[in-house]
């Protein structure tokens, strides 16, 4: 299978064109009490607060992130954005949308390689 490059440029990481920012995600009961809160959630700056809440509350792994794989996504973060990423605030938990994107893309890549779907490494 051949997949044409569409949204990235050769030699640049997939996140180079995206501006990122830290946010807070909360769930509140009808009475106003906070039942979930995650600080320092990093998402694309163009995302709505609802999109931020969905990824933080539904898609971030809260525990069990393999330490040997947890930081692999950082290799794709441009140098000028490394400061924003910072260290993970919670051990074993995802806090950055790039971690989710990398986890999913890497899984699909491994499945595709195993099934022989790709014509080349590129």
Model regions: which residues?
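Extended catalytic cores of very large enzyme megasubunits
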Residues: 1-122
């Amino acid at each position: 299978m051949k997949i044409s490059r569409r949204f990235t440029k050769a030699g640049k990481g997939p996140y180079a064109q995206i501006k990122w920012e830290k946010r807070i995600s909360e769930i509140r009961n009808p009475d106003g009490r906070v039942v979930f809160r995650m600080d320092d959630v990093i998402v694309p700056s163009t995302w709505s607060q609802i999109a931020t809440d969905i990824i933080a509350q539904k898609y971030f792994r809260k525990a069990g992130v393999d330490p040997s794989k947890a930081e692999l996504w950082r290799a794709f973060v441009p140098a000028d954005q490394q400061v924003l990423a910072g260290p993970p605030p919670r051990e074993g938990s995802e806090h950055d949308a790039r971690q989710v994107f990398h986890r999913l893309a890497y899984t699909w890549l491994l499945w595709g390689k195993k099934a022989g779907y790709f014509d080349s490494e590129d």
